Amino acid sequence: MGRVDAAALIQMGHVDAQHYLANATERGDPLTPETLMMTAAEPGISFQETMQGNFSLGATDPDAGAAAGQSAGTTLAIHVTVTVRDLDRFTADPNHNGSLVGTVDFTPLGLAMPAGQGVFRLFAPADAANTTLMVYELPFEHGGQAYYLAGAKRIHDDPGFDLWSDTTTLYTRLFEGSDATGKVVGAGVLRLNAAAFARVTASVRAVDASSPVEAARLIAQFGGFFARELWKSYAPGPFK
């Protein structure tokens, strides 16, 4: 516990590569030990999550895309490792930003397509009242074309018990290009079933913790934040 795993190393490599490309001169930088040294990372937590569901090219609305995908028998799946570092900053940030890397499976395009440094936000503000979002966004390429998969779980207390469906349903669109401003070329709804949710919970671990005590503290801090935000959204009015 607390050691750097493969997913964290990949993520750190992505960050350092992006920093290098953004700041490199035409002649590049010298290959000195200082240049090649990987950036030190703040301790945090990570977890792994797989979501899949019906998805269709040509659709622009997630529900319509899910219906079309069900009729055609086409599904899309994402397999991601989410990392949240510097939990004090994370909880203070209104958008609660983390990051993710992973792969995308979508038979019309390909399987295990690598997705680079993506966006993760937990309980981020939404335009609608009394609503927050769990945001998952992944850039990937296929056949020389850049794509951007953007999805959100909508956290909003409706009549009845909807906490489970809200936290396990990802409304997703596929954009051409490197961000969510491009043309929408597909849409669908991805879900997390009970077995997959149990695997998410079991995968939560501390990263770069200095000791088992710090690792336990990091996991407890993240778990406490998650529970408090759910309580704010779903607890009966007098108890919030």
PLM feature segments, named:
Residues G2-P33:
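All-alpha RGS (Regulator of G-protein Signaling) helical domain and cognate RGS-like helical scaffolds
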Residues L36-K240:
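Beta-strand-enriched cores of mature, soluble protein domains
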